[in-house]
Amino acid sequence: MSLRLQEKYEKEVVPALMDKFGYKNIMQAPKLEKIVINMGVGEAKDNPKVLESAVNDLTIITGQKPVLTRAKKSIANFKLRENMAIGCKVTLRKQYMYEFADKLMNVALPRVRDFSGVSDKSFDGRGNYSLGIKEQLIFPEIEYDKIDKVRGMDIVFVTTANTDEEAKELLRLFGMPFAQK
């Protein structure tokens, strides 16, 4: 099953990147490697049921069961014990990744209130892009009546690009709505 974004990458994005950056071989063109979605649930230390609903939300949004993230060490001030479940994350690759990216860029982000584009300053220097979302309600699969609490999430686009400029161009060609200066 070939996806719209994957076809767009092969037919439009790669030739455009090769022109702009002067690559000799199509394998030199940067590509999307994976998308990691993380949901930190701090309240989970007091109420484990909260984590269940976060896992549920993430499963509905991504179509893949999340892995629980656990505390690396105990911190007394936060009443946190080592190995306590405090969040969940999903790593999407291949078709799931393209499906999610397509849904995020074309459906979810335009539904954000007062949306004027995502920041282009969130690159890490190695060609990866991070994005924070304040509420899970922007995804059409989440029903407003069925959520117990509004939760945010971190989304990281991992690319094979060597520089931020290459990664930004890759995401821009995919249709990421960067804010206009």
UniProtKB/Swiss-Prot annotation:
Task: Tell me what this protein is called.
Answer: Large ribosomal subunit protein uL5
Keyword list (alphabetical) reads: Ribonucleoprotein, Ribosomal protein, RNA-binding, rRNA-binding, tRNA-binding
According to the UniProt record, which cysteines are disulfide-bonded?
none
Reply yes or no: does the keyword RNA-binding apply.
Answer: yes
Does the UniProt entry include the keyword Lyase? no
Which Gene3D superfamilies is this protein grouped with?
3.30.1440.10
What is known about what this protein does?
Answer: This is one of the proteins that bind and probably mediate the attachment of the 5S RNA into the large ribosomal subunit, where it forms part of the central protuberance. In the 70S ribosome it contacts protein S13 of the 30S subunit (bridge B1b), connecting the 2 subunits; this bridge is implicated in subunit movement. Contacts the P site tRNA; the 5S rRNA and some of its associated proteins might help stabilize positioning of ribosome-bound tRNAs.
Q: Please report the organism this UniProt entry assigns to the protein.
A: Clostridium kluyveri (strain ATCC 8527 / DSM 555 / NBRC 12016 / NCIMB 10680 / K1)
- Pull one GO CC term from this UniProt entry: ribonucleoprotein complex
**Family in the record:** Belongs to the universal ribosomal protein uL5 family.
Gene that codes for this?
A: rplE
Q: Which GO terms describe its molecular function?
A: rRNA binding; structural constituent of ribosome; tRNA binding
* Subunit-structure text: Part of the 50S ribosomal subunit; part of the 5S rRNA/L5/L18/L25 subcomplex. Contacts the 5S rRNA and the P site tRNA. Forms a bridge to the 30S subunit in the 70S ribosome.
GO BP annotations of the record are: translation
